[in-house]
């Protein structure tokens, strides 16, 4: 008589989730050294097997180009040997970070003599649903392993070959280092049904983190029965105040918009105080033109566009809410700082907003009134990043207020539990 495994009657996604849950239980109590050794093995394996990864990625890139995918999205999909080495370097950076598991968040001895400690513990099984950025595959795996979590990865079908190769390399390295290989799994299948099944795996998957565009995030938030940490889109604003250093403002604007356009911390809207519009806008528009940026302008910006050389088109209502992820920016003139704040409140995705000003009073009011994960004063929006904040690699940038907000590093991939120690204490 053949004995059936309990896994035999399960769908591939459910089977993967059960295996992840088992692996998470094995991973949670491991010491830092064991996890770090596994991560170092992952970094080494990525470098040794770079050609295997790049060859798989080339198939995804060719398919994307044949489908007419924009070059900005193709760039996010592409893995070169240099980019694979950078991913390996990022994994080594995670090794150098403190292990949050077991950290005592707070502790005290109660009046009755009981010792109370709140300590960090892994979340358990983390599901990541993301679009065509294969570097996320390794970043997520590294952060989850370091924080003692198992991870189920569901990337875009456009990067399926790349992700398959990356996960194969990571699993081989993790298993070879003596950790459960099932702590890192690619969700089986390329169909949308596999995504829906992952979203319904409550009780097996402890949290889902979607990374991608507004449509993806909205779908996960609305349809998931698993708790979701929402990583929002990046409709980021740069506001040039009446008291701005205009040279600084041009530099910050161009860096925020054009350094890398296909990322969530790139600026998508420029707001300019009316008192500096006549002096600032011709310079800003010329600089944007030199950077190849098309400006979607309101009528007050249009009035300053003559002889700037800028590619300026009339803004539509949709422009104010658009995360372009391209060489486009919306622009408007506002009557006051408070009007800028009103505009941001109406259209922001809650990611990052910047003010350029020499006025401490204006900076203070802006930072108090704007309710986003990051409010920047005289700095580029591009600094909203786990690496730039010193957190190491990030799992995403949360734009919600519960559990985590802003760049999510290792501590944000943990929860806490209370350890209560007594000496025969009973409650009377």
Swiss-Prot record:
Keyword list, A-Z: Amino-acid biosynthesis, Cytoplasm, NADP, Oxidoreductase, Proline biosynthesis
Metabolic or biological pathway, per its Swiss-Prot or TrEMBL entry: Amino-acid biosynthesis; L-proline biosynthesis; L-glutamate 5-semialdehyde from L-glutamate: step 2/2
Annotated catalysed reactions: L-glutamate 5-semialdehyde + phosphate + NADP(+) = L-glutamyl 5-phosphate + NADPH + H(+)
Subcellular location: Cytoplasm
MF term (GO), any: glutamate-5-semialdehyde dehydrogenase activity
Matching Gene3D superfamilies: Aldehyde Dehydrogenase, Chain A, domain 1 (3.40.605.10), Aldehyde Dehydrogenase, Chain A, domain 2 (3.40.309.10)
GO CC field: cytoplasm
Residues annotated as transmembrane: none
GO biological process: L-proline biosynthetic process
Annotated NCBIfam families: PRK00197.1, proA
Function: Catalyzes the NADPH-dependent reduction of L-glutamate 5-phosphate into L-glutamate 5-semialdehyde and phosphate. The product spontaneously undergoes cyclization to form 1-pyrroline-5-carboxylate.
Family of this protein: Belongs to the gamma-glutamyl phosphate reductase family.
Name the UniProt record assigns to this protein: Gamma-glutamyl phosphate reductase
Gene that encodes it: proA
């Amino acid at each position: 008589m053949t004995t059936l495994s309990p896994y035999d009657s399960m769908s591939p996604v459910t089977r993967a989730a059960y295996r992840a849950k088992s692996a998470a239980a094995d991973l949670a109590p491991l010491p830092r050294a064991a996890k770090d050794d596994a991560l170092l093995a992952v970094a080494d394996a990525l470098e040794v097997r770079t050609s295997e990864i790049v060859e798989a990625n080339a198939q995804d890139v060719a398919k994307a180009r044949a489908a007419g995918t924009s070059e900005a999205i193709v760039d996010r999909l592409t893995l070169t040997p240099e980019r694979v080495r950078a991913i390996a370097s990022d994994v080594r950076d995670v090794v150098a970070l403190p292990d949050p598991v077991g950290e005592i968040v707070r502790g005290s001895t109660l009046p009755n003599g009981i010792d109370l400690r709140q300590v960090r513990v892994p979340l358990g099984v983390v599901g990541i649903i993301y679009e065509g950025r294969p570097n996320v595959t390794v970043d997520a795996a590294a952060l989850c392993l370091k924080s003692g979590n198992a991870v189920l990865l569901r990337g875009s079908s456009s990067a399926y070959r790349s992700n398959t190769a990356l996960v194969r390399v990571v699993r081989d390295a993790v298993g070879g280092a003596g950790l459960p290989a099932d702590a890192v799994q690619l969700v089986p299948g390329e169909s949308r049904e596999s995504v829906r099944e992952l979203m319904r795996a409550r009780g097996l998957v402890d949290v889902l983190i979607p990374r991608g565009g507004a449509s993806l995030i909205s779908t996960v938030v609305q349809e998931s029965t698993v708790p979701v940490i929402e990583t929002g889109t990046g409709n980021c604003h740069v506001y040039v105040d009446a008291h701005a250093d205009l040279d600084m403002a041009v530099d910050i604007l161009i860096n925020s918009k054009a350094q890398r356009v296909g990322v969530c911390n790139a600026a998508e809207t420029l707001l300019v105080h009316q008192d500096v519009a006549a002096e600032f806008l011709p310079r800003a528009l010329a600089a944007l033109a030199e950077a190849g940026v098309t400006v979607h302008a309101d009528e007050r910006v249009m009035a300053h566009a003559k002889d700037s050389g800028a590619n300026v088109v009339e803004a539509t209502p949709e422009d104010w809410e658009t995360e372009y992820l391209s060489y486009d920016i919306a622009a408007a003139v506002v009557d006051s700082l408070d009007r800028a704040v009103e505009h941001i409140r109406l259209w922001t995705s809650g990611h990052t907003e910047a003010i350029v000003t020499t006025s401490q009073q204006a900076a203070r009011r802006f930072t108090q009134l704007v309710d986003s994960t990051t409010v920047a004063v005289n700095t580029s929006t591009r600094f909203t990043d786990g690496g730039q904040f010193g957190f190491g690699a990030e799992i995403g940038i949360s734009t919600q207020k519960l559990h985590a907000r802003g760049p999510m590093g290792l501590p944000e991939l943990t929860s806490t539990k209370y350890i209560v120690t007594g000496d025969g204490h009973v409650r009377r």
